[in-house]
Amino acid sequence: MSDLIHDFIFQSARRNPAAEALVYGQRRLDYGTLAEAVSRVTQGLLALGLQRAERVAVYLEKNVENVAAMFGAASAGGVFVPVNPLLKPEQVGYILADCNVRVLVTSADRLRLLVPVLASCPDLRTVIVTGSADKLVPVDGLQVLAWDAAVADNGQPRAPHRVIDTDMAAILYTSGSTGKPKGVVLSHRNMVAGAASVASYLENTPSDRILAVLPLSFDYGLSQLTTAFLSGATAVLINHLFAGDILKAVVAEKITGLAAVPPLWIQVAQLAWPEDCTLRYLTNSGGAMQRPTLDALRRALPRAKPFLMYGLTEAFRSTYLPPAELDRRPDSMGKAIPNAEVMVLRPDGSECDPGEPGELVHRGALVSLGYWNDPAKTAERFKPFVSAQRGLTLTEMAVWSGDTVRKDEEGFLYFITRADEMIKTSGYRVSPSEVEEVVYAREMVGEAAAIGVNHPTLGQAIVVIAYPREGATLTDAALLAACKPHLPAYMVPQKIVIAAASLPRNPNGKIDRKLLSQQYENTFMEADQ
């Protein structure tokens, strides 16, 4: 197996160049053709003078050029920065400036929107524009090239910059649930180890066809490509608008593997799936899948094995629950993935007892290189792990997740809450997920989020925003009455809001708790005035 992420494609091309590697709409690339496309990008970037470890940002919807640009940048010895296509110009400008991007790959339409913010990106030198060359937009002070011109054969091949597995491969920006987004620096080693670990427990083979639904800027979304290319499988790209688009793609492309986040699974579970569906497995990450959704998925897709996973961008993937354990412990996030150790620690660094809440700490090959250009945040989350072996002088870095979990007597882990989402009300600390589990269990809602908002006497009050299940009629009074018997008094929501539309999402498809908190932050303060 390769030590470098781009070699996944080249090795699969050497093994079976005619095997289908990438599908996007009507475009179908075998591994030989994809390897050639990546090599052309590599040579194009080197011809532009890209130096070792310089950043190449890719701001595109999922398509062939997006994939070729990312892996081509890595192959050249650079670092790719996938930018979520849903981000607005100001957010994109922040990322380009923050990680000192040298080359930007985008479309003509997106470039037009970005022009006002590019002046604040002093390290940017070149923009490569996909699509028709006649749509090029000139930008003062920047070299603007058409894709075909940038990747054209320029004669004598240039040798890529030499990199090793501990060098940077990518910078992935978090969704910004707490303040400005942070750039998580992933090495080749991180990404290769992550792909190998996930592919091993999903048992991926060249016969798999994996649907890439999630943004490639999301570590979980990017993982669909890396596991596919490592395994010699086929990755099918989709820029979906509705859950029904996913069903159509699964059927048309005979998809065997599907990854999604909880809000999307809620919609997918409500679809009428054919009995002969080819799905072999489903994976969930980005938040806990509620029991009613899991049960509905298992009824709709009885032959597909659900893998419940937990991961943080800072360590790619951390845990998974084997499908065989679902009936015994459907609320568990499982145990550590292969080649990782996951611990539950007290603030003093000692191991928690079974049932005792503590912070999830991850060590091993998947732990990233920290946050780009942010030594304070890096020092806060990435700390030396002191080995129990007294003779070992040097320490390794582990990542402290900020997530509170517990383990049972058999070592299976259970998520409690994120430290920055904990609701502090009437002197109690309440996990939003505890309240949400009760709300979902009433089987009246399709989506729900519990948040803490400022309150003049309670410190924070619990507010639940709920969106009804399809075809259901729901009132705040009915939902409150249904939940009250199942909650201690301090956990009973002070307010329930019935949303008129699906709850807002952040760029990674998760329910946007930060936005909801902002929308309702003055609810009780205004009422008190």
PLM regions with names:
Residues 30-32, 162, 169-193:
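Conserved AMP-binding A3 loop
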Residues 87, 104-106, 250, 258, ...:
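AMP-binding/adenylate-forming catalytic core of the ANL superfamily
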Residues 192-209, 216-257, 271:
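Conserved AMP-binding/adenylation subdomain of ANL enzymes
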Residues 47-48, 75-149, 470-472:
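Structural core segment of the AMP-binding/adenylate-forming
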Residues 2-5, 10, 18-63, 67-71, ...:
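Conserved AMP-binding/adenylate-forming core of the ANL superfamily
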Residues 230, 255-260, 269-329, 341, ...:
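Gly/Ser/Thr-rich phosphate-binding loop
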Residues 2, 17-18, 128, 144, ...:
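Conserved pre-ATP/AMP-binding loop-to-beta segment of ANL
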